[in-house]
């Protein structure tokens, strides 16, 4: 349970960094509002690359009975939340990259080294 809480907190911190640092709007709907993963309900889980950039590991999830989806075309790792849960902390993994389409992370033929991090590791990096 504590591990899930730590992963959720990490996801929120990284998503905030990604959303606030984005130069473009992440939402293509007609409302004109920016899509912010951390304010729309439940945070999406992320894995980090070598530079500490967090990328979602799934393009949709259940949030208190409602299905939430990452916007079309956003980058993702195809490992899913279960894959992230099986990863060992701070060990490098070869993760397949993709783009979100209809709530599914569709592989794009590329891969990247990714890591599962902890809240403590994130705080050290931010200090």
From Swiss-Prot:
Pfam families: EVA_Class_A (PF19429). Disulfide bonds join 42-63, 59-100, 76-105, 95-114. Residues 1-21 form the signal peptide. The keyword Secreted applies. One of its GO terms (molecular function) is C-C chemokine binding. It is found in: Secreted. It comes from the Eukaryota. Keywords: Disulfide bond, Glycoprotein, Secreted, Signal. Glycans are attached at residues 49, 94. Its main location: secreted. GO terms for cellular component: extracellular region. InterPro entries: EVA_Class_A. Salivary chemokine-binding protein which binds to host chemokines CCL1, CCL2, CCL3 and CCL5. This is Evasin P467.
